[in-house]
Every structure is written in C-alpha cells, then in structure tokens.
Amino acid sequence: MGDAGGHSHHHQHGFQPQLLSFGGVGHHHHLHQFTAQPQPPAASHTRGRGGGGEIVPATTTPRSRGGGGGGGGEIVAVQGGHIVRSTGRKDRHSKVCTARGPRDRRVRLSAHTAIQFYDVQDRLGYDRPSKAVDWLIKNAKDAIDKLDVLPAWQPTAGGAGAGNAAAPPSSSTHPDSAENSDDQAQAITVAHTAFDFAGGGSGGTSFLPPSLDSDAIADTIKSFFPMGGTAGGEASSSTTAAQSSAMGFQSYTPDLLSRTGSQSQELRLSLQSLPDPMFHHQQHRHGGGGGGGNGTTQQALFSGAANYSFGGGAMWATEQQAQNQRMLPWNVPDPGGGGGAAYLFNVSQQAAHMQAAAAALGGHQSQFFFQRGPLQSSNQPSERGWPETVEADNQMSHHQGGLSPSVSAAIGFAAPGIGFSGFRLPARIQGDEEHNGGGGGNGDKPPPPSSVSSASHH
C-alpha cells in the first residue's frame, strides 16, 4: 500500500495541497520535497518498514501539527512513527508524520531521478519501489548517520503517546474549522445583501456588510429620486433608506407604474409636495390707482402630496387617451384683498380639438410654452374637489382666461420678474392675448359649472 507506480504518484499530487493547506505547513514542505528529493524516500522508507530506531526521533516532534495537517484524519501508531489516515474524499491516501509536518507517502521524482531509481530497482530485482529504497538507505547508512539529527519527540508512555497524538488533531482543527465557518458566514452575508431593500424595515441592517454604507445608499437613491422631506437627510440607516424608497416607487400610484414599464425610456422627476394645497402664481394685484405697480405676490407651490412625473414616451400618449380631463382657470383670493390668478390643471394626451385662450395677468402677458412630453399628476382625488372652489372664487377674479373644456396639455406660466419659464408640454393654444390696464378689464368667462362638475368625475 505504501508503494505506487509513477503514474499514480503524478495523479494524486494535484490533491495534496488541498489537504496540506489545513495544517498551514504541509504545502511548504511539499515544495521541499522537490528541492531535496533524496530525503523523502528515506522518510517514507522509515515509516513503511518501521526500522531504523535513529530515524524515529525525527518523526515524533510535530505530531500535534501533523494531526491538523491530516484534516481530521485518524493517527495510527506504527513501527518507527505514526501515520495519518485521511478521511477526506479528495485524497484517500494516508500521510506520514515527519519533523516538518505530514507528508504524502507517495513521492514524485524528477524524470532523471526516476530513470535512475527504476534502473536500480530492476537491477536489484525488486518488484516494489519501497524495497529498492530500503536497499539504498541501508547502503547509505553511514552517510545518513553523519547528518544532523532533527529534534526528537519524547513520549511519556505508549498509550499516553497515542492519546496525545490523537488529541492535537481536534484542537488544531477547531481553529481552522472556525475560520472556515467565518469565511462561509461572510460569504452568506454578502449573498443575502443582494441589495435587499424589499425587506422594508425588518432586519435590513443585519444583512448589510460594513462595506455598504447606509448613508451612501440613501444618498444614491435620493440623487435619482429626490423625495425631500423625510427621505432627504434623515436616512441614517438602511431601514430608513428601504422605507423611504422601495427605489422611490411607492410614491407613485399603481396606474402610473403600469404606464411606466420602460424605465430606461422615461425621465421621472419626483417633486416633493409643499404644505400649501394650492398652486399659486405670482402676479400683480388688480385694483385702483393706489394698488401699487408690483402688487402682492404669492408663492408658486405644487398642490397636495402629489409627485408629478414627467415623461416623454409615446406609450403614455396612447394609454392616457382614456382619461377626460379639463383645464380650469382658477383665482386664488389674495390675503391682501386682491385676486390672484392661477391655473389648476390636469394633463392627458387625448387627441381632439385643442383650443385654449390666453389670459392677461396684471397687465403683463402670460407666455405659454409647449413641447413634447406629458405632465401627469398622481394626485387625482385632490383635484376632483377643486371645481367647487373654482366656482366660488370666480367672483373675486378681475381677470380670467377662458379655456376650452377639453384640452390635451398643461400650460406653463411666465410673468416678468418671476423667471419661471413654465412647463413645456404638447398642445395648441388658439386665441388672442389681452392686455388689461389700471384697475379694470374684461376677461373671458370660465367654462360653465356643468362642464366643471363633469370634469371632476373623470
């Protein structure tokens, strides 16, 4: 069993580093066999035949290390030393305990040395290589005795020695197994991270390795989806990032998600809602001569908790045609007494006759800009109740713009001194712009209440 042909030596050599790597020293000594090849035959011969009492001390010292190198193998005492019987599946061959750690009983020789060795074996007439090695060691005994003797292991008793030899493998194997388990646990942790934001807030931090900074994740999400409010600046943990974003899509309505199947073709801008539920537009106060030139200005705020999505895909045009939406002129009462003109709008790509009229805002012309790209409001319920407010506030308006009951675009506002260029959306506006002077003026009337109420039901 200790002898094998040259082919088997070469075949099993590939598995040897895997077993020897557990001990930490076996791999190094395996390389040592290539540099000093005459020594391994002597070691294997000594273990195999159990002779040569002077060689035994050289094999006894590192038994504790040899057990660890065996990868949990069984240590068996033999004449002249000990062998480690491997229990692994990759390397089924036993190893011998040496002063430099466990070594394979099979020795691989260089081509030139193998030719000479088999020539000696054939000339001696031996059928096994180990017999030829025994003959070589016996004839070289005088030269071997002149070599330095390696540190010897002194066993206290035969049974105790075997027990001590059997004990170290478990003690030396545990650190390796613990280290391997740590590596596996780390690999599992990285595998479970797979950017698991879908967990909401349940155990999100336990799966994040130190390399993934939760703040960096939150900043990255906010750069693509500027949520503002709670999502901006307060995301200090992965759970907060997971709750404030599910990649930022929970803020959109389900019908919007169904329309936006192709994410790469659309640009979504999520605008955080502001406290004021109305959309104000800065304007001049309409009043008498003492009203002043600039008048009272109001902030331009986006309505409600709506996140507006801007997209330019043609897919939206076909899917939004089923919605009937209206554009209504609406005047917001000015706290200072004047009426402020603003527009409540909802957008669709409904292809029909597109008409609208421009309204004058405080003696300045309102500019309307249109381009490709719909503006979809995701806050539909809040706008359905607004026509009643529009009807009540129309009495306070000095100037209004009458618009067609059915339009397919939203209007962008521009007034001198505001610098707000407006939203650029597809539409056609037909009509004349009117200029109003001083304190009074005429304006087109808004759509009748019947059309207003019907718009709220779509």
UniProtKB/Swiss-Prot annotation:
Hydrolase found in the keyword field: no
Keywords: Activator, Developmental protein, DNA-binding, Nucleus, Transcription, Transcription regulation
PROSITE patterns, sorted: TCP (PS51369)
Any Gene Ontology CC annotation: nucleus
Localisation per UniProt entry: Nucleus
Compositional bias segments (type: Gly residues): 65-74
Statement: the UniProt record of this protein carries the keyword Transcription: yes
GO MF terms, alphabetically ordered: DNA-binding transcription factor activity; sequence-specific DNA binding
InterPro entries: TF_TCP_subgr (IPR017887), Transcription_factor_TCP (IPR005333)
Pfam families found in the cross-reference section: TCP (PF03634)
All copies of domain TCP, residue ranges: 89-147
Region (Disordered): 1-103, 159-182, 278-299, 424-458
Quaternary context: Forms homodimers and heterodimers.
Function statement: Transcription activator. Binds the promoter core sequence 5'-GGNCC-3'.
Record protein name field: Transcription factor PCF5
Lineage of producing organism: Eukaryota, Viridiplantae, Streptophyta, Embryophyta, Tracheophyta
Gene expressing this chain: PCF5
